């Protein structure tokens, strides 16, 4: 009898834990911010997990070439993509082209964005506010508009394209530019570099604008040449922003579709994004699985880039300049004529690109 009454008075430890957990859950969801966070977290998980599972299933599926239905599951799609008889033309060449275009796009983005950021933050350039606003236009504009602008300017009747016509440049000058300037690696990388140049401008411009000039001034006092100050002092301080820009532009350019399909497909210059789309949505159901394998490759590359960014961010060393007062960087003089000429050139370039 006593043991029965004791069991009634003392609840089961399991139910005590359940009740405690329920109270903690109610307390957690009692905060609106936590509820919103969990909701969007679950939504994000579903929007990424379901497509990922679907893609992985498709990579393992073999479809009937005529009926298009799944006949079996095998690793054959992976073998055909990486080591099959058509792997070189279907996968490796487009992948190498994409990597080359992405590297070149990083160069152009750093060139355009870096030079503009330096001119605006370190010189007496005219129309700084206007140029800063206009410089964002190439990124705001859709990629395909920039690609169409390039093609309409430089296309000509001499290129190897069935639908070739006389573009604006040929109509005005009578000069037919070579094929490589209209279609292929160079125009794709150039347009992508122009499109993503605002990334470099924002990241590098922020560092240049807030950079402590004491180190640069100390180097100048020691009679170190200005070009050496730039490469030995300024550039190292910009390294984190440069690396972030490279990772951001590289990953974006690698997965770009609109520009490669406009400036590459007319001459059968396929990158991995356009090749993947052609294989997935093409008329041959037998190679759709290989196209999905390519999408997995793009996802893996994206994850690797994210991990590299996290690693370099976590291992970045912080330096502090101990001084009485932070100095402002010296404004470089472009000259009475130079500042107007450079300003007009930048405005013209960015207006044409936007």
Task: Label each region the model flagged.
Residues 1-39, 310-347:
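Transmembrane alpha-helical segments of polytopic membrane transport and secretion proteins
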Residues 30-66, 83-208, 237-258, 262-264, ...:
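Membrane-water interface segments at the C-terminal ends of transmembrane alpha-helices
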Residues 67-70, 258-285:
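Glycine-rich helix-loop "coupling/hinge" segments at transmembrane-helix boundaries
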Residues 69-70, 74, 217, 225-229, ...:
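Juxtamembrane inter-helical linkers in multi-pass membrane proteins
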Residues 73-86, 230-231:
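A short amphipathic helical element positioned immediately N-terminal to and/or at the very start
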Residues 139, 198, 216-219, 228-230:
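Internal catalytic domains of large membrane-associated glycosyltransferases
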Residues 211-214:
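Short glycine/proline-centered loop/turn elements that form peptide/ligand docking sites
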Residues 222-224, 236:
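Glycine/proline-centered hinge or cleavage motifs at structural transition points of membrane proteins
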């Amino acid at each position: 009898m006593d043991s029965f009454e004791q069991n009634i008075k003392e609840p089961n430890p399991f139910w005590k834990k359940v009740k405690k957990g329920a109270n903690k859950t109610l307390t957690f969801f009692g905060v609106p911010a936590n509820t919103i966070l969990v909701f969007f977290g679950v939504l994000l998980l579903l929007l990424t997990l379901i497509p990922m599972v679907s893609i992985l299933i498709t990579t393992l599926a073999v479809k009937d070439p005529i009926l298009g239905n799944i006949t079996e599951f095998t690793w054959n799609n992976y073998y055909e993509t990486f080591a099959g008889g058509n792997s070189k033309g279907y996968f490796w060449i487009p992948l190498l082209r994409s990597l080359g275009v992405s590297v070149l796009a990083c160069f152009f983005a750093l060139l355009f964005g870096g030079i503009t950021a330096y001119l605006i933050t370190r010189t007496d350039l005219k129309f700084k506010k206007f140029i800063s606003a206009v410089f964002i236009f190439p990124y705001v504009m859709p990629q395909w508009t920039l690609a169409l602008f390039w093609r309409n300017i430089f296309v000509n009747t001499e290129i190897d394209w069935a639908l070739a016509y006389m573009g604006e440049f040929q109509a005005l000058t009578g000069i037919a530019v070579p094929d490589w300037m209209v279609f292929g690696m160079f125009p794709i990388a150039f347009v992508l570099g122009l499109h993503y140049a605002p990334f470099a401008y924002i990241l590098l411009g922020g560092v240049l604008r807030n950079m402590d000039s004491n180190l640069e001034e100390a180097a100048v006092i020691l009679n170190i040449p200005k070009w050496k100050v730039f490469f030995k002092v300024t550039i190292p301080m910009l390294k984190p922003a440069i690396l972030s820009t490279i990772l951001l532009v590289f990953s974006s350019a690698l997965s770009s579709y609109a520009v490669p399909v406009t400036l590459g497909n007319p001459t059968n210059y396929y990158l991995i994004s356009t090749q993947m789309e052609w294989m997935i949505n093409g008329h041959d159901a037998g190679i759709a699985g290989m196209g999905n394998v390519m999408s997995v490759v793009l996802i893996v590359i994206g994850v690797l880039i994210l991990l590299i960014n996290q690693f370099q961010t976590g291992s970045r060393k912080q330096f502090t300049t101990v001084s009485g007062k932070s100095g402002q960087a010296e404004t470089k003089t472009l000259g009475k004529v130079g500042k107007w000429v450079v300003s007009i050139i930048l405005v013209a370039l960015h207006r044409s690109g936007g």
